[in-house]
Structures are given as structure tokens and as C-alpha cells.
From Swiss-Prot:
Similarity remark: Belongs to the NAPRTase family.
Catalytic activities: nicotinate + 5-phospho-alpha-D-ribose 1-diphosphate + ATP + H2O = nicotinate beta-D-ribonucleotide + ADP + phosphate + diphosphate
Record carries keyword Zinc-finger: no
Presence of the UniProt keyword Phosphoprotein in the record: yes
BP-aspect Gene Ontology terms: NAD biosynthetic process via the salvage pathway
InterPro entries: N/Namide_PRibTrfase, NAPRTase_N, Nic_PRibTrfase, Nic_PRibTrfase-Fam, Nicotinate_pribotase-like_C
GO CC term, one of those recorded: cytosol
Any Pfam family: NAPRTase_N
Organism: Burkholderia cenocepacia (strain HI2424)
Protein name per the record: Nicotinate phosphoribosyltransferase
The protein's annotated pathway: Cofactor biosynthesis; NAD(+) biosynthesis; nicotinate D-ribonucleotide from nicotinate: step 1/1
Residues recorded as bearing Phosphohistidine in the entry: H217
Source organism, top-level taxon: Bacteria
PANTHER family (UniProt xref): NICOTINATE PHOSPHORIBOSYLTRANSFERASE
Length: 399
């Protein structure tokens, strides 16, 4: 069985789930899967994927896992008590061949947000591992280890990068769980203080690594349907986050509606309240410069704020960003696929995104063309109108 612990997921799933329990327990949502890698035939593996998901739905939290969560300063005891009763229910997920053909599969997760939020990360990890264990029956781990050593060597070679730290954000698109755990341990031992932590809660617990994460796109997307007014949905999301965490976990995700809309909403109050912001699409250098100017315009010293970069990073890009912004702000880098699925094979670009909340379409208007995902073109156009965002000429809104 691929997933053997419900902690084998990213920390931000638990931080968002706690907000859902306390503020949106009645919300109903729908998520959909998409593989962005062309020419990949996943249909032959449907039965294997279903079997693995069935195993996932048999899991419960162990006492030692609950105790670990309870010790986190931002996790409340009633949430841990809820998790003690929790399990994923197979009735909320369907996995079928897509009517489009071409090897595509449809994975639809639909049900109460509180009871479906933990599906995404392990299901993506399952799809990845099932695919690669069938297509690469004798993985070249030697090549993977050599590539990982080169990355560690590159980051640690120059003394001016001694304060440049990276984190593992690679659970969802990892080659396999065994390889992911080896990567996390190799980074911990090879980078020392340059390894900031991991988003994976299980490996954080097992190996005394710092767990990292705050919010994901789905949280701010859901607020489109849960807030009082669509135009204020991003503000509403940040306010509810602050209401729950009272200044803790203060990294705001910036690209649900694009950078312009984010800066319009992220006023002086939020600039001072939140510790920083996370970049996940668009040009990271331009984004960083705009964030620093925005902090200065709102009477915040950028040197006290954190810029988190997490979009398709590799070590050379991390180093370029560090060189550009070091000394001007605090920096954090989350590296995903390039760490956990770099053995010489083409990684799958797969996602599971929320598409509806309480029966209403929800969407992400990314700063990167092709990253937006919405099944309702009319709603996407309306959302752009409300937030004053132009339609990118090279984006297929139906994706």
C-alpha cells in the first residue's frame, strides 16, 4: 500500500482543515483531477489507483500522530479530537476513464469540504507512484542520488549562500514515497541548517524535521462562494485566516486572482498583520520587486517580511532569486518536483483543483497562462470582470 499514514500529506491541509472545522463546517465542494502532461495514458492503471484509494480510506490517525499534531502551537485540541474520529470515505471519490479518451482519467472528489480536504495530496501521490512503478520497473536511483548530491553540492559550495535555505515541497508529485523519504533525509543530513524543513507531516514527525505550510489556493477559492461579496472574497479569506490564527501562520498566497488584484486587497493592515507572501506563478523576480515596493508604500520595512518562492523551482533559480533579494527581505524557498521526482524521467504535471463550492463555480486566475482551471467559462469571464483582470491571449480558459 502506497499511503500508510494520514500524516503522509502536506501541513497546509491540516491548517486549512482546522479553519474549515471552525468556520465552514457545512461547506460542500467539488475537486477535479487534470494531467497537464500530453500523451500520458493513465487508463490502464485505474484499477490499481482505485485499490490504493480504497486502502487510503481504511486509514485512521494513530495516537502518536495525534499527539504530534497536538504539540504544534497553532493546532487546537478540539481539531485533534475531531481527527481522532476522522477517516476518508470512498463514497466521496470516483475514478473513471475520461469520455474524451486519449488515456485521460477523471477523478472527481465531491462532498463536505471537511471530509474531502485530505484527499488531494495522497491521491496525487498515488497516481504518480502507480504510474512510475508500472512504467519504470527498475528505477535508476543511482542517477537520482547523483543528481541530488549535485544539488546539495551546488547550494553548499559558496560561502555567500550559507544563509540560503530550501524546503521540500514535493509530496504531491514525488516519484515514490520511498524515494521521497530518502530525499528528505539526504537533504537534512547534507544541507544541515540550509535545509529549512518539509511540507510532509509524516517525515517531519519521523525524522525531527520542521514541518512547513500555511494556506493553498483552494482556501481562497472557496471563499468566492463563502464570503459576503465576490469582490471582497480575497479580503474575507485573509480576515478569516487571521481570526483563526491571530497572527500565526502569516504567509499570504498571492496568485489566486493575479498579482494586481492581490496588491489591491493586501492593504496596510494585511501588510503589517501577515509575516509575508508566497509566489506560486508568474515571473518571480518581477513579483519580488513589486512586493518590496508594496511594503515600502505601506510603511512596512521589507527587511522584516518574508518572501516565499515555490513555483517550479530548481537550485540554480533558487540561487538567482537569493542573489537578487538577499539583505532586502527575509527569504524562503520551497522546491517540489525538482527534488522528489528528478531521476531522469519526465515527471507528470498533475493537479487536483477545487472547481465548485456550495454548488457555485470557483476558480484561480493564475499569473501563469495554463494554470487556471475552471469548468465554467462564463464564471471565469465574470471573475475577471469583477477583479479587473484581462484575459491572457494564450490561455485556454476551458482547461
Amino acid at each position: 500500500m502506497i499511503i500508510t499514514s494520514l500524516l503522509d500529506t502536506d501541513l497546509y491541509k491540516f491548517t486549512m482543515m482546522q479553519v474549515v472545522l471552525h468556520h465552514f463546517p457545512a461547506a460542500n465542494v467539488e475537486y477535479r483531477f487534470r494531467c497537464r502532461t500530453p500523451g500520458v495514458d493513465l487508463v490502464p492503471y485505474i484499477d490499481e489507483i482505485r485499490d490504493e484509494v480504497r486502502g487510503l480510506c481504511s486509514l485512521r490517525f494513530a495516537d502518536v500522530e495525534l499527539d504530534y499534531l497536538r504539540r504544534m502551537r497553532f493546532i487546537k485540541s478540539d481539531f485533534v479530537d475531531f481527527l481522532a474520529l476522522f477517516h476518508l470515505n470512498e463514497k466521496y471519490i470516483s475514478i473513471t476513464p475520461s469520455p474524451k479518451g486519449n488515456g485521460e482519467i477523471d477523478i472527481v472528489i465531491e462532498g463536505p469540504w471537511l471530509h474531502t480536504i485530505l484527499f488531494e495530496i495522497p491521491v496525487l501521490a498515488i497516481v504518480n507512484e502507480v504510474y512510475f512503478r508500472n512504467t519504470q520497473r527498475e528505477p535508476d536511483y543511482r542517477e537520482g542520488r547523483e543528481r541530488l548530491r549535485e544539488k546539495i553540492k551546488l547550494l553548499g559550495a559558496k560561502p555567500e549562500f550559507a544563509d540560503c535555505k530550501i524546503a521540500d515541497y514535493g509530496t504531491r508529485r514525488r516519484f515514490s514515497k520511498v524515494w521521497h523519504e530518502e530525499v528528505a533525509l539526504t537533504l537534512r543530513d547534507g544541507l544541515g541548517p540550509q535545509f529549512a524543513g518539509t511540507s510532509n507531516v509524516l517525515y517531519a514527525m519521523k525524522h525531527d524535521i520542521t514541518p512547513l505550510g500555511t494556506m493553498a489556493h483552494e482556501y481562497l477559492q472557496a471563499c468566492q462562494a463563502l464570503g459576503p461579496r465576490l469582490r471582497d472574497s480575497q479580503i474575507y479569506g485573509f480576515e478569516m485566516w487571521a481570526k483563526e490564527y491571530r497572527g500565526d501562520l502569516g504567509i499570504a498566497l498571492s496568485d489566486v486572482y493575479g498579482m494586481d488584484a492581490f496588491l489591491n486587497d493586501f492593504d496596510m493592515y494585511f501588510c503589517k498583520l501577515f509575516d509575508g507572501a508566497r509566489h506560486d506563478s508568474g515571473d518571480p523576480f518581477e513579483w519580488g520587486e513589486r512586493m518590496l515596493r508594496h511594503y515600502e508604500a505601506n510603511r512596512c520595512d521589507p527587511r522584516t517580511k518574508v518572501l516565499v518562492f515555490s513555483d517550479a523551482l530548481d537550485i540554480p533559480k533558487v540561487m538567482q532569486l537569493y542573489e537578487r533579494f538577499r539583505g532586502r527581505c527575509k527569504l524562503a524557498f520551497g522546491v517540489g518536483t525538482n527534488l522528489t521526482n528528478d531521476l531522469g524521467y519526465v515527471p507528470l504535471q498533475i493537479v487536483i483543483k477545487m472547481v465548485r463550492c456550495n454548488g457555485q463555480p470557483v476558480a484561480k486566475l493564475s499569473d501563469s497562462p495554463g494554470k487556471s482551471m475552471c469548468d465554467d467559462k462564463a464564471y471565469l469571464a465574470y471573475l475577471r470582470q469583477v477583479f479587473g483582470i484581462a484575459q491572457p491571449v494564450d490561455e485556454d480558459a476551458s482547461k
